């Protein structure tokens, strides 16, 4: 097999992964708090046929060498944590983060996860939970006789009890930040989990230590740009076609060789 067949095959694999990433971005264009991904690639090792700087004669050296590449491989899918637009919902249970930070969520197995999706609900006990039913940490419990809930930009949650005029504070929504957001592991259900690459979670009050502010009655929309993803899809499709053409051309060359 001539090397160009294998090189083109690695190109096909890379563009297929790129298309998978783009498709997932487009599929989540309406997902609250979704952060788009991009595939990152690197070239494979090179075969050095002539080393640059070696002698070409007694008194001269080669100004450049001869190296043949062996293809490409994917190395990562990087999340782009740019801010999504804030969409007004007028629901008192919806909270958008404008800036860096994540809400902290308790999973059924006891582990902690993190989310940008602030479209919260109340469970049967009046506890603030995600759409999947996972409670927010610290716990926020809304009294059954409350008639109004207010969440401040700094995360302080207060309610007005029926028959009273002054609101009372019942809790605080904190934000979690990380040194390396790209190191977080995506779990699905709009959740992320810390890893060694992300660094330890930094618990802070909204608006402090580089975190964003909270906006009640809004949700953060996906940061996917449909037009940009469609352009990326066209480029990926063309790259896939070119690599396929390269395989066909290499095959024709092999056929010619076999006929000699």
UniProtKB/Swiss-Prot annotation:
Transmembrane segments: none annotated. Pfam families: Flg_bb_rod, Flg_bbr_C, LlgE_F_G_D1. It comes from the Bacteria. Keywords: Bacterial flagellum. It is found in: Bacterial flagellum basal body. The keyword rRNA-binding does not apply. GO terms for biological process: bacterial-type flagellum-dependent swarming motility. Its main location: other. GO terms for cellular component: bacterial-type flagellum basal body, distal rod. Signal peptide: none annotated. The basal body constitutes a major portion of the flagellar organelle and consists of four rings (L,P,S, and M) mounted on a central rod. The rod consists of about 26 subunits of FlgG in the distal portion, and FlgB, FlgC and FlgF are thought to build up the proximal portion of the rod with about 6 subunits each. Belongs to the flagella basal body rod proteins family. NCBIfam families: FlgEFG_subfam, flgG_G_neg. This is Flagellar basal-body rod protein FlgG. It comes from Buchnera aphidicola subsp. Schizaphis graminum (strain Sg).
């Amino acid at each position: 097999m001539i090397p160009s067949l294998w090189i083109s095959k690695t190109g096909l694999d890379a563009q297929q992964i790129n298309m998978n990433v783009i498709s997932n971005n487009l599929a989540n264009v309406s997902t609250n708090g979704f952060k788009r991904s991009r595939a990152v690639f690197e070239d494979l090792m090179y075969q050095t046929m002539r080393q640059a700087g070696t002698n070409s004669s007694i008194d001269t050296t080669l100004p450049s060498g001869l190296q043949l590449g062996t293809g490409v491989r994917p190395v990562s899918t990087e999340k782009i944590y740019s801010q999504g637009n804030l969409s007004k919902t007028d629901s008192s249970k919806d909270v958008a983060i404008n800036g860096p930070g994540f809400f902290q969520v308790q999973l059924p197995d006891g582990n902690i996860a993190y989310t940008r999706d602030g479209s919260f609900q109340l469970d049967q006990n009046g506890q603030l939970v995600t759409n999947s039913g996972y409670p927010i940490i610290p716990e926020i419990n809304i009294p059954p006789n409350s008639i109004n809930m207010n969440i401040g930009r700094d995360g302080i949650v207060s309610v007005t009890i029926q028959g009273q005029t002054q609101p009372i504070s019942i809790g605080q929504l904190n934000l979690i930040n990380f040194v390396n957001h790209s190191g977080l592991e995506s779990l699905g259900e709009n959740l992320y989990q810390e890893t060694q690459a992300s660094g330890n979670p930094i618990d802070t009050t909204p608006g402090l230590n580089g975190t964003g502010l909270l906006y009640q009655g809004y949700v953060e929309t996906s940061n996917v740009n449909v037009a940009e993803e469609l352009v990326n899809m066209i480029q990926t499709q063309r790259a896939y076609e070119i690599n396929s053409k390269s395989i066909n051309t290499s095959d024709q060359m092999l056929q010619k060789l076999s006929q000699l």
